[in-house]
Regions:
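Walker A/P-loop NTP-binding motif
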Residues: 64, 84-101, 121, 208-210
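Conserved helicase ATPase core of P-loop NTP-dependent helicases/translocases
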Residues: 140-147, 323-344
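Conserved Walker A/P-loop ATP-binding site and its immediately adjacent core
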Residues: 88, 102-126, 130-141, 160-165, ...
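Post-DEXD/H (motif II) to motif III coupling segment of the RecA-like Helicase ATP-binding lobe
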Residues: 179, 187-254
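Conserved helix/coil segment N-terminal to the catalytic DExD/H
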Residues: 137-180, 188-194
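Conserved pre-motif I regulatory segment
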Residues: 12-79
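Conserved strand-helix element at the start of the C-terminal RecA-like helicase core
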Residues: 104-115, 288-318, 324-328
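Walker A/P-loop
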Residues: 69-93, 105-111
Length: 344
């Protein structure tokens, strides 16, 4: 069963007040923001404003059903644009579930840089019961993280799908009870899972087996900014994701993907007389890079990792080399960390 219609589900007043207090004390916000979502895509395309608070309450209520052994507990899938505050929608329930029930929330995410950014952002806010494990950590560091998780010092634990599928769950959590599993960047389950990172393709099956092995239920909350709704025209990433992650029964929230603060400026490249295409492209990129160096944060996508470091030297005058850097998967992890920090 896929439920798309927006239905108000309200926490008891005591719980609702606790959620509002966490919003203020941890994040420093007085009120929740609104998300623009479709009311019921099975019937039309009417949009409405959905408070982050309402969605957070639903996540908590589904987790509480799991605690009570209620088999009617739903999973959830949300599509919303980047910048809509999706991380708050699972972090705040995780903090609440940890405080109230000592439950652990697992966040499965494909991108190490995103994991580190979210964990560090929470720590900067003063919340310390969060940790992550990745290949960038030494074995000793990872073992210390697992110890903290097992001993109840961590309520929000980030890891990759490859790591989750590589070990028995007790290796990470010990006797801790899982209250919520979050799949961030959920579109990668289908877009990457078939060929690029195959563990994504088996993630849903693994989570189902995990529930059976543990003998209790917990909701899975999947979030993405880029899944496409197209049930009649093919290439429907939303239903592919629901099927792959075994999310049914699922409460589905489809938000608008258009961001009003993003524009596109497509300009045809000019090739001067006697100039080859490659020379014209190099000249154009070099000119644009010089423009961007005027105090603007800019990301330029290059199709190949190999050769990008040499290309940078041709695009930028030597006096400005310290303002630019290349970033790709095989770069040294210390260098990548320094680049991310400098870009911030």
């Amino acid at each position: 069963m896929i439920e798309s219609q927006i239905v108000a589900r309200v926490l008891p007043s005591k719980c609702r007040e606790a959620v509002k207090v966490l919003l203020q004390e941890v994040y420093g916000y007085e009120d929740f923001r609104n998300l623009e979502v479709y009311d019921d895509l099975f019937r039309g395309k009417e949009k409405l404003q959905l408070s982050q608070g309402q969605l957070i309450e639903e996540v908590i209520m589904e987790a509480e059903k799991g605690i009570k052994g209620d088999s009617s507990a739903h999973n959830l899938l949300l599509t919303a644009p980047t910048g809509a505050g999706k991380s708050l929608l699972f972090q705040l329930p995780a903090i609440y579930l940890g405080n109230e029930y000592k439950l652990l929330t697992l966040v499965v995410s494909p991108l190490k840089a995103l994991i580190v950014d979210q964990v560090e952002a929470l720590r900067e806010l003063g919340y310390e019961r969060v940790a992550y494990a990745s290949s960038d950590l030494s074995p000793e560091q990872k073992n210390e993280v697992y110890r903290r998780v097992r001993e109840g010092e961590v309520d929000l634990f980030y890891l990759s799908p490859e790591l989750l599928l590589a070990y028995d769950i007790s290796y990470f959590v010990g006797e801790r009870r899982i209250g919520l599993v979050v799949v961030d960047e959920a579109h990668t389950v289908t877009t990457w899972g078939k060929e690029f990172r195959v563990d994504y393709w088996f993630l849903g099956r693994h989570l189902e087996a995990l529930k059976n092995a543990l003998g209790y239920v917990f909701p899975v909350f999947a979030l993405t900014a880029t899944a496409v709704w197209n049930p009649e025209g093919g290439n429907d990433m939303i239903f592919d994701t629901i099927r792959s992650l075994h999310l049914a029964p699922c409460a589905l929230y489809v938000g608008t993907v258009k961001r009003e603060n993003i524009g596109f400026d497509i300009t045809a490249m000019t090739i001067e007389e006697g100039e080859t295409y490659d020379k014209a492209k190099q000249r154009t990129v070099a000119a644009r890079v010089e423009d961007f160096l005027d105090g603007h944060k800019t990301i330029i996508y290059y199709p190949f990792a190999g050769g990008i470091d040499i290309k940078l030297k041709t695009w930028v005058y030597p006096a400005n080399w310290h303002w630019v850097a290349s970033y790709y998967g095989k770069k040294d992890k210390e260098q990548k960390a320094e680049i991310i920090q400098a870009f911030k």
